[in-house]
């Protein structure tokens, strides 16, 4: 960003010395400048009034001279009165000379007073320029500070990127540890499957033993006298059945609660997925709104810049038109002055014109040398600007190539993001039955809410910035309108003043023409009286006039050649200025394009960082989801194995219960049969005592067998319970270990997420600070451009005022030359009057005449002239 300062010099040379004025680019001193210009205009108006008064007095003096000449003509008859009249005329002429000297002194005093005021104004302007330079140095220091802050922020961003890389490395290490833990979990799953296989084998052995027991029970069908013992066994089995039914009911209730919890988790996961989709839609909408605001603001800024450029072009066209009109008026004035100079037939005026022409030629030569120097400087500036333009174009091409690379990377990242989103959707569909996803979803929802709040804050900030930009734009438009109104007023005033000046010039020209005609009449009369002397003098002066005309023609030719050279140089300067403006405009456009490309690069970089962050978060969520999926699968497998075992136990118990119920029915039937048989046998007891003894022996044998079988059944049941307890304890330990490991991993994940959130917050703060600094630099750049535009407008106004001052000085110099010329004409007229008086005295000495008048009755007046001529023999 290059700072540009402009300084304009104005030099005017007068009788007292050179006056140099420096105009600086201070917006705050506009009002002071306008007040000073008003004071200068008032001084100029007072000087004009003084000069008008001098011209009136001069016209009065010319009238008095004409009256004196008339009196001289009337007083030719009386010599005594002529002497008195000559004395009176001498006194009047001395008075007139004193008056002219006083007027000249007053005009010099007023000019000296104006120069003093001008020098004071110049001193004040120089003080203002010093203040402006100090303010400019302060602004440059602040800009350097801002640049240093920007560099520090960039260094901080690089440090955050390095920290991000280290965090990625730690995440990769954690992923490796998670992979090792997964391998361990798979090994534990294998051990669990082996335990389940052993359990199934034991259950098969248990079933075989139960079959043997059933066969033994079938062998007990023939026992009829075990009613009481079997009843006790039935009661025991009933109690066991009731206990098992209670256990089954508790297991069914726990299964029902688990199913209800799983269904609620499914519903919550579906709601969270819907909420996440809604949050993503809101994010997309917010991004679209931000992009729309951004595009709208950029289009409005571009339109405003186009309007400002159009206004600048229109102002430049109007200024060029006014300059052409002024040049045409100046050419007209110069033509009028040339015509007047051709009409002037006196030698002294021609000599003065020659001196002026030589001085003007010298000034023009100096100006030509200055213009050549300016031309060389402008050419060097144009070459430097072309070099800068080429450098900026190269940088722009490099930036465009970098932007294309970033866009290509951004598209790749977008494709990866789409693929990850698809995988994420699949994982979300697969993880519909996981418990841990609920906490993750709640945390994500909270993070999304924070991001939504942040986006809303950014949107509010953007809206506030947009409103501020709108207010600034309105203020600038009001300033432009006010400046255009002031320009229109100034233009109207200067047009009115130009018209007044033209009218004054026309009136002066008419007066001078009348005076010239009167003088020509008087000269013609004097020439009629003094032909001989005038013829001699005429011949002498005609030769001088021809010589002077030749020299004047040569000077005019030189002047015309110099004016042509000056016009050519002015055309070249205007072309170079236009080329310079065009190059400067192209440079400005390149700088704007470079700033826009930098902003786009920054936006793309920010989007790329966001996409990287989103990719990392998606990868983390994917890994967490995979872990939770594996854990849930392991838990589901465990639950399925437990359910299978419970179902097998349930089926086993149901089969045992059905077998026991069948045994109970059979025993009930057998009891009835036994009762009948007992009733029969009671009758036949006596006859069957021998059979009873045998049966008692058999009964003792059966009881011994029964006791041995009961002992074996009890041992088997104890072994079964021990195996089931060992299996359940081992599964619970494994589950407890896995749950503890899952909790540790979740805690580590939460810590990593917190760290990541903190780093993201720091990055967002740094990005926000960088954006604020960029906005401040852009606003400073805009204010600098606005100040430059205002300075250019002020410079144009100052140029117009300079031209007016130059014109006023030229007019004052012309009026002074006219006064001097009229003084010379008066002196020449006095000399001629003296010569005429001497001639009259000679004529009167030669011829004496008496004038007698007589009144004839009837109203006629008779004049008798008697002449007496004296001749010397």
Curated annotation (Swiss-Prot):
Keyword annotations: Coiled coil, Cytoplasm, Motor protein, Muscle protein, Myosin, Thick filament
Tissue specificity note: Expressed in all tissues except in saliva.
InterPro entries linked: Myosin_tail, XRCC4-like_C
Cytoplasm found in the keyword field: yes
Span list, region Nonhelical region: 1-25, 853-873
Pfam families the record matches: Myosin_tail_1
Entry-linked Gene3D superfamilies: 1.20.5.340, 1.20.5.370, Vasodilator-stimulated phosphoprotein
Coiled coil (residue ranges): 26-852
GO cellular component, one term: myosin complex
Compartments it resides in: Cytoplasm, Myofibril
Subunit structure: Homodimer. Binds IgG and collagen.
Function description: Paramyosin is a major structural component of many thick filaments isolated from invertebrate muscles.
Family listed: Belongs to the paramyosin family.
Protein name: Paramyosin
